[in-house]
């Protein structure tokens, strides 16, 4: 992902359709503080509000950057047992236990519709496909997956492009 400053991010936010109340709650500095040198290995980045459950997801699978408002639900409950359910992320194909699972809802304020996907609760899919997180190591063992990190990154980019097309997003 290209390196962004607070000014760049503010310009992006003005280009997309976001609820005004969310704009003032977004925490760009807190959401990007861990990226001091690593912007190039990021395909998606969540800029969260103060609660961490809403925000703007920046997506850059190739050259173009996309942004979309999201809401995260960190509990996926099995209707039969009442326990948190494990999932496989729709973006990075990482297996997540119930404590690491979430569903993400993308909302278009002007179009009055939303789309929901299963995802990693930390939205660290770029790190998961590169096997730099503990969750990625556990997932690879659990799924008995033997493909290389480069192939996982390519798969993530392909899935992100599919989701961008499903949502009808335009580059910012």
Language-model features: locations:
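Charge-rich, low-complexity N-terminal segments
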Residues: 1-66
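Short cysteine-rich clusters marking metal-coordination/redox-active sites
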Residues: 89-92, 120
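Short Cys/His-rich Zn2+-coordinating modules
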Residues: 61-77, 104-106
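Short linker/helix segments within small regulatory modules
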Residues: 104-117
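Short flanking/linker segments adjacent to small metal-binding domains or redox-active Cys/His motifs
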Residues: 146-172
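Short metal-binding segments enriched for Cys and/or His
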Residues: 118-137
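Accessory, usually C-terminal, subdomains that scaffold auxiliary metal cofactors
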Residues: 136-146
């Amino acid at each position: 992902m290209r390196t962004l400053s607070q000014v760049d991010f503010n310009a992006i936010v003005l280009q997309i359709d976001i609820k005004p109340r969310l704009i003032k709650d977004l925490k760009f500095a807190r959401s990007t503080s861990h990226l001091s040198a690593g912007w190039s290995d990021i395909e998606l980045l969540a800029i969260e509000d103060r609660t961490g459950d809403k925000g703007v997801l920046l997506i850059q699978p190739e050259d173009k950057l996309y942004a979309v408002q999201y809401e995260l639900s960190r509990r996926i409950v099995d209707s039969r047992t009442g326990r948190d359910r494990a999932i496989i992320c729709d973006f990075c194909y990482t297996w997540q236990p119930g404590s690491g699972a979430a569903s993400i809802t993308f909302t278009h304020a002007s179009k009055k519709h939303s789309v929901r996907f299963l995802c990693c609760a930390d939205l660290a899919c770029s790190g998961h496909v590169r096997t730099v997180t503990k969750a990625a190591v556990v997932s690879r063992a659990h799924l008995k997956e033997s493909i290389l990190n480069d192939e996982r990154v390519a798969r993530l980019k392909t899935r992100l492009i599919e989701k961008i097309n499903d949502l009808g997003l335009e580059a910012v």
